[in-house]
Amino acid sequence: MNRRRFLKSSMAVAAVCGTSGVASLFSQAAFAEDAGIADGQTRRFDYTVLQAMAHDLARQPWGGAPRDLPPTLANLTPQAYNSIQYDANHSLWNNIEERKLDIQFFHVGMGFRRRVRMFSLDAATQQAREIHFRPELFKYNDAGVDTRQLEGQSDLGFAGFRVFKAPELARRDIVAFLGASYFRAVDSTYQYGLSARGLAVDTFTDTPEEFPDFTSFWFETVKGDATVFTVYALLDSPSITGAYKFTIHCQDTQVIMDVENHLYARKDIKQLGIAPMTSMFSCGNNERRMCDTIHPQIHDSDRLSMWLGNGEWVCRPLNNPQKLQFNAFQDKNPRGFGLLQLDRDFSHYQDVMGWYNKRPSLWVEPRNQWGKGAVSLMEIPTTGETLDNIVCFWQPEKAVKAGDELDFRYRLYWSAQPPVSTPLARVLATRTGMGGFPEGWAPGEHYPDKWARRFAIDFVGGDLKAAAPRGIEPVITLSSGEAKQIEILYVEPFDGYRILFDWYPTSDSTDPVEMRLFLRCQGEAISETWLYQYFPPAPDKRNYVDDRIMK
């Protein structure tokens, strides 16, 4: 699977991409003093122009993979690439007094081979100027770049851009677009985590996955006191093109992005992913197979949360399975979904490098009717934390045919907590472990006669306390096996209730077991729905190992 080579750390490297369709629309002109670093000829631009460009581009053959970079850039190591810094004195809005926002660009090089074009846009006059690459925009430090190979290469473009906000102008970025159509943002912690993408194509099909590129960006010039800005993007790939409009709100505690896109299919597409996001889950409370480190948990996100079109709230803890898993949760006009990192307790991670307790959640809020489809979740086996292994997106039910035009509007919230949550009791944590014995009597001299797996699901909030005197009933549904030893315990430290049950196999099958649980009081649901996928061991592994040496 090419994805493994594509996803590095938590920011993707663009490896298989296409070229921009705007090469003939803008030409270089003499440097204009009033345009800051923009040195291109002025041309009219607005969102309707971009839509026409994407529409026309879809009716042309795809331009192919990126052209080769000069060897001094193509052969950079990650360490050398990271040492290249943009010169803050040449930032996009450096000439705006008392500005609250600013833009800097990423250098092409290493795996970032796509030559992305950047334009400065005066929204009042609808005039855009290109910003051409030139070495003096960067500080190469000890990267070992032979700048002689870069002379006269104004068409090198850039790899992407990042956004800074006062009072951390030029010091700590809060938004980054880099690699294919990947982008990220932070909350008040300034800690990056999971990524979003402009579009996903054939992520889980019998054809190779396609990674569309943002090939050009247009930045509306901001006013000095603005904390909101608009950037437009052209997306291109072998199968589809797109016109994107991002309105990005850089708030104190979160970043909110209003996204609007118009998509134009070049070819039939088996699987289209809208509002895709990419994260990492190595191990957690519920999955400790790969946790032989000093860190109790390692993950960018701990769950998929869904607010279905019918109003039901669903919590699906993430897994690091032994083999790739793909699940589609059918829905109609979803109200929202996201990959969340709700456990913010440092002691649960003990990580002073990754700071997983500070990583943001990402919530998608559709802003128009998305119709029938599914929230799709792919979980890929991983042995550590340096490869993103979680993918989530909305997949429309209707197949995409060549010539189709689609449009989607949605809002992305990058924040510690999602903007909405269920008024019912919600899942706090999920734990699994050895079963088959009474809670509080972990096996000592004798293991249980029958093998079982225990599940503990903690619920908090809602009307749990009011419902307790009237009786709380766990409603458990399993695709196979039996649930026994079901218990409900009040847990004072988190002021909630723990639901315990042991899963007993009723066959030798190792197929995933789909589990579903919610709480009910006098016939009425009082909690969100917990979904889980458990992978039972082979029959010969269903035993308890006693490795004590007593001699």
Swiss-Prot record:
Keywords: Periplasm, Signal. PROSITE patterns: TAT. It comes from the Bacteria. One of its GO terms (cellular component) is outer membrane-bounded periplasmic space. Disulfide bonds: none annotated. One of its GO terms (molecular function) is catalytic activity. InterPro entries: Gal_mutarotase_sf_dom (IPR011013), GH-type_carb-bd (IPR014718), Glucan_biosyn_MdoD (IPR023724), Glucan_biosyn_MdoG/MdoD (IPR014438), Glucan_biosyn_MdoG_C (IPR007444), Ig-like_fold (IPR013783), Ig_E-set (IPR014756), TAT_signal (IPR006311). It is found in: Periplasm. GO terms for biological process: beta-glucan biosynthetic process. Residues 1-32 form the signal peptide. Predicted to be exported by the Tat system. The position of the signal peptide cleavage has not been experimentally proven. Its main location: periplasm. Probably involved in the control of the structural glucose backbone of osmoregulated periplasmic glucans (OPGs). HAMAP family: MdoD_OpgD. PANTHER family: GLUCANS BIOSYNTHESIS PROTEIN, GLUCANS BIOSYNTHESIS PROTEIN D. This is Glucans biosynthesis protein D.
